[in-house]
């Protein structure tokens, strides 16, 4: 062992490196993967594959719940790259902010197993955009998530009509899926009861 380093501190050092894997994934995504991605339209489905590393898993030997949002952040970033919007939005200093998310876990993802995340914009209203994300493997659907968010610039929300226009989308807004409509109503009820 290096001078002054005990076996415990060495173990903690390696644990720290393992937890850096999200940063490594982000750097790989930004500096390599986005340069070699396919192109999709604004309402297209983006797909990216990952593997559940041991550092992504918990004592139940499956992908820990706290990792799902981290993978989702990466997948949404990749979706913007596939749409051809990532560089443009960064140049405009438009930053995405999640307002709400709802998760339905169906089956677990075991250590070292590959899984794919499907990400797509399912619609928007006068204030928010809505995204659906699915975790899928050869075993089937593992988790489905709905995300509601906005883009902000200098502390102010980017109007949805400006965002959609910048994305080059000119068709009418798609109708929100029924489950998203009910979720939206539920969020409104929570807001009314708690503010």
What are these regions (language model features)?
Residues 2, 6, 12-36, 109-116, ...:
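HotDog/MaoC-like acyl-thioester-processing domains
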């Amino acid at each position: 062992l290096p001078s002054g380093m005990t076996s415990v501190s060495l173990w903690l050092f390696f644990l720290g490196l393992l937890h850096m894997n999200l940063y490594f994934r982000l750097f790989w995504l930004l500096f390599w993967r986005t340069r070699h991605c396919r192109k999709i339209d604004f309402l297209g489905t983006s797909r990216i594959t990952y593997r559940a590393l041991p550092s992504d898993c918990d004592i139940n030997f499956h992908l820990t719940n706290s990792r799902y949002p981290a993978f989702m952040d990466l997948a949404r970033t990749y979706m913007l790259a596939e749409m051809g919007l990532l560089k443009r939005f960064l140049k405009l200093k438009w930053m995405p902010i999640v307002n709400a998310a709802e998760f339905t876990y169906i089956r677990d993802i075991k250590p070292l197993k590959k899984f794919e995340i499907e990400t797509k914009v399912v619609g928007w209203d006068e204030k928010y955009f809505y995204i659906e994300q699915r975790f899928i493997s050869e075993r089937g659907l593992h988790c489905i998530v709905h995300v509601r968010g906005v883009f902000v610039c200098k502390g102010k929300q980017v109007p949805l009509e400006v965002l959609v226009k910048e994305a080059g989308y000119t068709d009418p807004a798609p109708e929100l899926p029924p489950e998203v409509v009910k979720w939206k109503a539920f969020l409104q009820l929570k807001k009314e009861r708690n503010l």
